[in-house]
């Protein structure tokens, strides 16, 4: 993911948590915050230390990033997203993870995602 599409700072994460809307399924919680003046979307990832070891957590983050790269044309611009992975993600394949991520994005009101 490009640098302009990432949320890295703690205060940016906190703003999305406090002011944004959340949607969830068994595998993910997605917080969404509208930012009209922003020309692109931004994504922040969070995988708890309760989920596996570092290898498993990094694998989950890589799969989420790859899914976002494939869906980038369908994700609404002008929004910040924070994606929190839950425990069931540790046993999922890439296809299952991507399908679950699409499901939770659709629940959050993104109409352009068709896959």
Swiss-Prot record:
GO biological process: tRNA 5'-leader removal
GO CC annotation: ribonuclease P complex
UniProt-listed PROSITE patterns: RIBONUCLEASE_P
Domain of life, source organism: Bacteria
Residue ranges the record marks as coiled coil: none
Record note on quaternary structure: Consists of a catalytic RNA component (M1 or rnpB) and a protein subunit.
Name of the protein: Ribonuclease P protein component
Organism of derivation: Bacillus mycoides (strain KBAB4) (Bacillus weihenstephanensis)
